[in-house]
Structure formats: C-alpha cells, structure tokens
Curated annotation (Swiss-Prot):
This is Small heat shock protein IbpA. Pfam families: HSP20. Signal peptide: none annotated. Residues 28-137 form the sHSP domain. It is found in: Cytoplasm. Monomer. Forms homomultimers of about 100-150 subunits at optimal growth temperatures. Conformation changes to monomers at high temperatures or high ionic concentrations. Associates with aggregated proteins, together with IbpB, to stabilize and protect them from irreversible denaturation and extensive proteolysis during heat shock and oxidative stress. Aggregated proteins bound to the IbpAB complex are more efficiently refolded and reactivated by the ATP-dependent chaperone systems ClpB and DnaK/DnaJ/GrpE. Its activity is ATP-independent. Belongs to the small heat shock protein (HSP20) family. It comes from the Bacteria. GO terms for biological process: protein stabilization.
Length: 137
C-alpha cells in the first residue's frame, strides 16, 4: 500500500512540526518500525535524532546525507554466529532507515553512545531569507 505525501500541505509550517511531518512521511514503511527512533527539539534551530542500534559497532553503521534525504544503514560485518536462544528480544537484523529533511536542515554530526546513535541536525536559514528591519525615514 502506498502512503501519500502530504508535505506540500505543510509549506507554511516552519521548525520542528514541519521536520517531524516530513520525517514521518518520508520514512520507509517496509522495516516495520525497526530500529526505533526519537526526534528531539534541542532548541529553536537544533534537532537531534536518536536511533536505538544495540548490537551494532560504529564501523557497521553508515550515515549518508544527500540533497534533503538522510539515510542510516546498519549491516553486521561477517557471519552471524548460530545461537540457541531461550528468548530473543534484541533484534540482530540489518536495517536501512530514511529520513526526508526539511529545507535548510543540515546534518552537523553523529555519535554512538550506549547503544544509541545520535544525529545532530541544524536549521540554517540563509541571510536572504531572514526577515530584515526596514528603517522609516
């Protein structure tokens, strides 16, 4: 089933609401919500995506930003060891998560800490698009 893209309806929205809506409509639905993630508003122009990547080493993760698309991939290196689980609650499968970013959103960096991959984003509005004060003479 195809999901419609309602992002043109949100053109008048700015900031987190618009980013959140674009992230929701732009993500791939085939991965079943794996891995789970959060989108946090740090301040007016700063955002942070936290993705739960338990079991992945730093070299097994790949982050790519191209145009307004952020792609996060996780692929386990080498062969998987066959284990006899009594209960398996931690998924060990590879993943690809796509995020559609709003205009003027740039990826500033990423770090892996305690099984969470943090990706920092910043909205940088060009000077030409910022409001300017007109002096009355």
């Amino acid at each position: 089933m195809r999901n419609p893209d309602f992002s043109p309806l949100y053109r008048s929205a700015i900031g987190f609401d618009r980013l959140f809506n674009l992230l929701e409509t732009g993500q791939t639905q085939s991965n079943g919500g794996y891995p789970p993630y959060n989108v946090e508003l740090v301040d007016e122009n700063q955002y942070r995506i936290a993705i739960a990547v338990a079991g992945f080493a730093e070299q097994e993760l790949d982050i790519t930003a191209h145009d307004n698309l952020l792609i996060v991939k996780g692929a386990h290196a080498g062969e998987q060891v066959a284990r006899n689980y009594l209960y398996q609650g931690i998924a060990e499968r590879n993943f690809e998560r796509k995020f559609q970013l709003a205009e003027h959103i740039q990826v500033k960096g990423a770090n892996l800490e305690n099984g969470l991959l943090y990706i920092d984003l910043e909205r940088i509005v060009p000077e030409a698009m910022k409001p300017r004060r007109i002096e009355i003479k």
